[in-house]
Every structure is written in C-alpha cells, then in structure tokens.
C-alpha cells in the first residue's frame, strides 16, 4: 500500500477512500483501487499467469518519464526494467517509456 500511495500521489492522484485492506486513488479522470490481504501474500504474483500482465500510466511528456525515473524510481531503489527510459519504435513512432516493478513484482509502465 505504501508504494502505491507514494507512486500515485507523485503522479497527481489523491487518495479518495481507504480501509484496513484496501485503498483507492483518483485524479479526476481515472480511479485505481488496491487491495492487500495478508492471507494471499505468499501466493505471489507472476505477470505470465492468467490475469494482469502490467499497468501503464500516460505521461504528459517525455520529460515527465525522465523525471519519474530520476526523481522517484532511482532515489527509492525501485527495480527498473529494460535499462531505463528509452524509445520503443516497435510499438509506435515516438513511444518513450520506463518500465519498473512494484514490491510484488507487478510490472508498471510510464509512457509518453
């Protein structure tokens, strides 16, 4: 929960609801809810199983992608994937993103 609180607040989301085992954040355009039950913690997450592969968040600019990397990910020692922010021309022209993992190894993407 602490990771998503810090990450989503950094992106400009505000916490709109919270309880013992859940929390939700919104930014006026989207809402994100996270649940965390201790009894399921040991089963782990793998993005290749059926279900969620990763979550992507839209950046306003390439500079915002770089800023997330340098101001949020690196100082917190968050695991960054694929060498950091870069272009992915195989997706589309100008696709610029940074991929990283949350503490449960869920892959996240911040893309311009």
Regions found by a protein language model. Give the residues of each.
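Vicinal oxygen chelate
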Residues: 56-103
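Conserved catalytic-core motifs of GNAT/GCN5-like acyltransferases
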Residues: 14-18, 88, 111-112
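Alpha-helical elements of the RecA-like P-loop NTPase motor core of helicases
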Residues: 2, 66, 108
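Short, contiguous alpha-helical
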Residues: 100-112
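Core segments of cupin and vicinal oxygen chelate
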Residues: 1-33
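Long, continuous compositionally biased terminal/linker segments
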Residues: 27-69
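Residue-level marker for the onset of beta-strands and adjacent loop->beta junctions
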Residues: 19-21, 53, 96
């Amino acid at each position: 929960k602490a990771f998503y609180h810090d990450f989503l607040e950094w992106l400009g989301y505000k916490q709109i609801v919270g309880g013992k085992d859940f929390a939700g954040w919104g930014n006026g355009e989207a809402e994100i809810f996270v649940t965390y039950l201790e009894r399921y913690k040991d089963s782990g997450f793998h993005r290749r199983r059926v279900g969620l592969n990763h979550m992507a968040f839209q950046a306003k600019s390439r500079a915002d992608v770089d800023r997330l990397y340098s101001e949020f990910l690196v100082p917190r020692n968050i695991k960054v994937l694929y060498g950091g922010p870069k272009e992915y021309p195989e997706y589309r022209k100008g696709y610029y993103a940074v991929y990283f993992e949350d503490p449960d190894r869920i892959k996240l993407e911040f893309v311009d």
